[in-house]
Amino acid sequence: MAKTLNENGVETEIVSIGVKAMQGCIACNRCRELERCVFQDELYDRIRKQLEDGIDGLIVGSPTYYAGPNGSLCALLDRVFYSSSDLMKYKPAAAVTVCRRGGASATLDRLNKYFTINHMPVVSSQYWNIVHGMLPGDALQDAEGLQTMRMLGKNMAWLLENIAKEKKYPEIESAIRTNFIR
């Protein structure tokens, strides 16, 4: 997908968690005062800086574990999205997942929730943004999955180009926070 984005004039950078353990959000709300998460780590700082520097879009990928995204990724995304929600607005985003057989749609659902609660247009493809494989290199044999990724790259590039032309965003209303009791 990065190749397709690059061919369409979109600069890409891949940020990988790898095997790093991530601190999860503890809902201390200090980020509201500090305008950043209280927990310091290299990946959070790197992503936060990219957001502050004005990245135009975001693609988040994860393997599927027990019908959900990687736990370290969710811990990082919880912190990034909660502490940086104002920097996310109107940035096109897409989720991508890989799985052996099943659980990928639940993984996509979880990842897409980060985007939809932050005023981010979700970029789609010709099918769900999934490739199949179990071992490194297996996904390269998934012709349909690879085509889906190429189309996702083209759709992301198209949306980024059209947003850059217009740059007129809807006015956001102040949030009304309720719960199920009232």
What are these language model-derived features?
Residues 22-24, 103, 132:
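Generic structural signal for helix capping and beta-alpha/helix-loop junctions
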Residues 1-10:
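A short, Lys/Arg-enriched amphipathic alpha-helix followed by its capping loop at the start of a domain
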Residues 20, 42, 71, 106, ...:
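Conserved active-site and cofactor/substrate-binding residues in soluble primary-metabolism enzymes
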Residues 6, 116, 150:
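Anion (oxyanion) recognition and catalysis
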Residues 121-182:
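Glycine-rich phosphate/pyrophosphate-binding loop and the adjoining helix
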Residues 10-20:
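A short beta-strand-loop structural module common to alpha/beta enzyme folds
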Residues 38-127:
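Helix-loop-strand module that forms the ligand-binding subsite of alpha/beta enzymes
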Residues 20-53, 177-182:
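Cysteine-cluster motifs in flexible loop/terminal segments that predominantly coordinate metals
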